[in-house]
Structure formats: C-alpha cells, structure tokens
Amino acid sequence: MPTTPSAQGSGNQNTATSQQIVNNFRELIKDPKSLDEAVNYMYQTLLDDAVAGIFIETHHLRKTGNLSALDGVAEDSTYRICEMPNLDIFGISTAKKPMDCTCPNCDRLVAAARFAPHLEKCMGMGRISSRIASRRLATKEGSSAALLHSGGNAGGTDDEDDVDWSSDKRKKKSSQSSRNNGSKKNNGKTF
C-alpha cells in the first residue's frame, strides 16, 4: 500500500499550502485505482481546514472577550397581546388625551388647536399687530420730522406709543361719493 498524504500525520496536512493540496490531488487522480483514495484525501483536507478555522476563530473570540457576540443578541420574549379595556393590543392607551399647551409669553394653558393663533396675538406678531406697528412707525417718523422743524416739543405724549391708544388725528376714510365724482355707476366715468 503506497504512502499517501492522508496516511501521514494530520499536522503536515494543516501546514500544506493550497498549491501543495492541488498537486497531491492531481497525482492521485492519475491512477484510476487510487481515485477513491484521492477523494478521501480531498475531503479530509477540506474538513481539517474548516474545523481548524472554527477553532482558531473561537479561541480568538474567547481571548478577546467577544465570545458572547458569537451567540448574537437574545430575542425578546414573544410579543404579548394586551386585552385590557382602553388599551390597544400593544398596551398603549387609546383614550383621547386633552392636548393643552402652555404659552411661553403669558403662562396660560391653551388648547393645542388654538395655540398658534393665541401665541401670535399674545406676542403681537399677527397681521393686525403688524399694521399697528407700521402705523406707529409712520406716526413716529412724522412726529420726529415735526420735532426737527419746530426745534422743540411738538406736544406729543407717551400715549401715542401705546398700541391700544387711539388718536383723534387719524385720517378719515374718503367717502364713496368723493372718489367717484358722485356717481356709483361706471366709477364716475362718462361715455
């Protein structure tokens, strides 16, 4: 019986390179009588290589403290269905919760649906507030121009700066008749 690499020690097989394995396999295939021996040799070599790789990897993971990572993350227990009143199947309350927000400006509780309009009015940032602010700026510019021309106090008071103070000096709206030359029809145009 000829001596084959499988009959030699398994230590030599582990150190054999892939080129040596291929060369040995080709020599064994040349003789049809030793074909069974060649298949056993190839199987044993591949099995030894795979087992040695697993051993080396497991040893490395144990030494580095990462062996628990090989097991993976433990799965939670199976999902439980909750069958209590006012709870959905996951155990979360289905009751409508009153959504109230606290205004950062006045510390009032305001319904969530009304929070944005409330905050807009509370901080003076709304459409009407911007009109009042632009009107206030226009009156300040007019009064400062009067102060420069007169050289003294124009008689203004602090009340003019207040948002809720109404001045008698406001311009009255022009009447419809003066705009249309007395005619409502055809916007005062004659044909």
Curated annotation (Swiss-Prot):
The modification Phosphoserine is found at S167. Residues 175-191 have a biased composition (Low complexity). Its main location: nucleus. Residues 146-191 are annotated as: Disordered. A zinc finger (SGF11-type) spans 101-122. GO terms for biological process: chromatin organization; mRNA export from nucleus; positive regulation of DNA-templated transcription; protein transport; regulation of transcription by RNA polymerase II. It is found in: Nucleus, Nucleoplasm; Cytoplasm. InterPro entries: SAGA_su_Sgf11, SGF11. GO terms for molecular function: transcription coactivator activity; zinc ion binding. It holds the Pfam family Sgf11. The keyword Nucleus applies. Keywords: Activator, Chromatin regulator, Cytoplasm, Metal-binding, mRNA transport, Nucleus, Phosphoprotein, Protein transport, Transcription, Transcription regulation, Translocation, Transport, Zinc, Zinc-finger. One of its GO terms (cellular component) is DUBm complex. HAMAP family: Sgf11 (MF_03047). Component of some SAGA transcription coactivator-HAT complexes, at least composed of Ada2b, not/nonstop, Pcaf/Gcn5, Sgf11 and Spt3. Within the SAGA complex, Sgf11, e(y)2, and not/nonstop form an additional subcomplex of SAGA called the DUB module (deubiquitination module). Interacts directly with not/nonstop. Interacts with the AMEX complex component xmas-2. Interacts with Cbp80; important for promoter recruitment of Sgf11 that is not associated with the DUB module. The long N-terminal helix forms part of the 'assembly lobe' of the SAGA deubiquitination module. The C-terminal SGF11-type zinc-finger domain together with the C-terminal catalytic domain of not/nonstop forms the 'catalytic lobe' of the SAGA deubiquitination module. Component of the transcription regulatory histone acetylation (HAT) complex SAGA, a multiprotein complex that activates transcription by remodeling chromatin and mediating histone acetylation and deubiquitination. Within the SAGA complex, participates in a subcomplex that specifically deubiquitinates histone H2B. The SAGA complex is recruited to specific gene promoters by activators, where it is required for transcription. Required for nuclear receptor-mediated transactivation. Binds independently on SAGA to promoters in an RNA-dependent manner. Belongs to the SGF11 family. This is SAGA-associated factor 11 homolog. It comes from Drosophila ananassae. The lineage of its organism: Eukaryota, Metazoa, Ecdysozoa, Arthropoda, Hexapoda.
